Amino acid sequence: MPVITLPDGSQRAFDNPVSVLDVANDIGPGLAKATIAGKVNGELVDAVDMIDADAQLQIITAKDEEGLEILRHSCAHLLGHAIKQLWPNTKMAIGPVIDNGFYYDVDMEESLTQEDLAKLEKRMLELAKTNYNVVKNKVSWQEARDAFEARGESYKMEILDENISKDDRPALYQHEEYTDMCRGPHVPNMKFCHHFKLMKVAGAYWRGDSDNKMLQRIYGTAWADKKQLKSYLQRLEEAEKRDHRKIGKALNLFHWQEEAPGMVFWHNDGWSIYTELESFVRKKLREYGYDEVKGPLMMDRSLWEKSGHWDKYAENMFTTESEKREYAVKPMNCPGHVQIFNQGLKSYRDLPLRMAEFGCCHRNEPSGALHGLMRVRGFTQDDAHIFCTEEQILEEVSGCIKMVYETYAAFGFENIKVKLSTRPEKRVGADEIWDKSEAALAEALKANDIEFDYQPGEGAFYGPKIEFTLHDCLDRAWQCGTVQLDFSMPGRLGSTYVAEDGERKVPVMIHRAILGSLERFIGILTEEFAGFFPLWLAPQQVVVMNITDKQADYASDCVKKLQDLGFRAKSDLRNEKIGFKIREHTLKRIPYMLVVGDKEMEAGEVAVRSRRGDDLGKMGLEDFIAMAQQEVVEKTIK
């Protein structure tokens, strides 16, 4: 007689084993109608799965994050159902859930077009609207293999042969005549899968291996209701308008070339943003007591072997040879900083030692993964390493956390999610060191009243880390900042200090980045502001325009005064209509346009317009300067 305990603590007793759906029905018909799955003792199960012992149960609906993921996974199966009806010879590979949707890799002779996607989406909707039940069957390994062999599903057979034990009982999900294999859970009925859209088709190698066959990957998005789907598609449309690659081209900020994949060509205005951002971070470093250093771009293979990078990270490193020695271009700054620490005897009185670098790093990312400024091969990290004692960890990590939040606030980012990533399978260091590291980071977060989630297995190979993820105006997540403890690398590279008792000890090393990489952060800012950078960051801050040649000298004088005070200002003295000039500079998103005619020249004034189209009226040049200076100092976002 199972006793079911619900999230509110209430209990319900049953005379016989019950399914999740039975319990939902017992609570109320409305809940039963909305039930997608259940979570029994913390484990997700299908709505039809039976509970035969006392258990904790949470009913999962489309309002839950897990429910939305299940719904999306079932839409992937729905895609399989539809594609096999339209193209029966298609071989199905894998169809997992991804952020905001799903995909399915398929092997078929036809190259799918946008028209084919529309036809496939239409058939999916026709099938879903019949509201058929999804039937789950647990079968033996051999029964599953026989089922897929009869259908010629070679990829499913390979998954069974290589990834599933013959002692297991795989779950087969029946969508009318279509059968798929999955760990589940899935929706009990297709009434939950009416709100989806197929987005695009791309190529993908089977198992991500370029030696294998290229498949077609069909991407889709799915949501709980029509309103959510519409909202998501609108966000995508807005994201397309804000694409930093388009804005970068329109504003002449940067470009890329095939001759240097993943490397950025910075133009004058783009580099202005870069250097301003660097200066902002440099000022923060001084406030928080960091020394700024610069390490070499390449170092001998032997150092990377000692640090552990050669063993764990070699495939991502660019290498070269000279005079029979092998070198690696640095993918990270940490080993170089350890070398600087190791110069000269260090005492406990020298700790904490905070070392920062705008370090130029290179990583051999796959060409298919490169994406504008967001995923590059050459980038600059706002990297820092703090060498400290174990007793100083809490205070130092707390300082890093405070610095992260202050920096993000300057750009208007307030929605920040924090995760603590713990030990991965491939790692260096003993388990007791990892225990100590993970506990120290968790303690620092709790001490600063920071809510966080654990990410098991997602830490770097040398230590656990705190990850700070920004959410932008389109609610997209960008993981930028990290604070990472490392009890391993200093010891591996021979770092010691003289403790208070005269003994030699190995310092703790804290890896810290706030922006992550300057390139990627500029990409994020470009899309966040849609190119309307705040005044302090804008590459061109002010343009002064004359109406006729008569005011050219006055306009030039205004520009010189602005430039002398540090403003990035220029004049536009072309013999063009003022309306034409205003439109042109508005499109360039220059924050302020100052128009000078005879009246303004005689009164020593300027007529001020903003890039948003606001006419701010006439004011003395000194008054405008005071207003603009305040905006720069306060880092106002408009």
From Swiss-Prot:
Any single GO BP term: threonyl-tRNA aminoacylation
GO CC entries: cytosol
Signal peptide, first to last residue: none
Cofactor remark from the record: Binds 1 zinc ion per subunit.
Keyword Secreted part of the UniProt annotation: no
Principal location class: cytoplasm
Domain TGS, residue spans: 1-61
InterPro entries named in the record: aa-tRNA-synt_IIb (IPR002314), aa-tRNA-synth_II (IPR006195), aa-tRNA-synth_II/BPL/LPL (IPR045864), Anticodon-bd (IPR004154), Anticodon-bd_dom_sf (IPR036621), Beta-grasp_dom_sf (IPR012675), TGS (IPR004095), TGS-like (IPR012676)
GO molecular function, one term: ATP binding
NCBIfam families linked to this entry: thrS
Descriptive protein name: Threonine--tRNA ligase
Taxonomic source organism: Alteromonas mediterranea (strain DSM 17117 / CIP 110805 / LMG 28347 / Deep ecotype)
Gene that encodes the chain: thrS
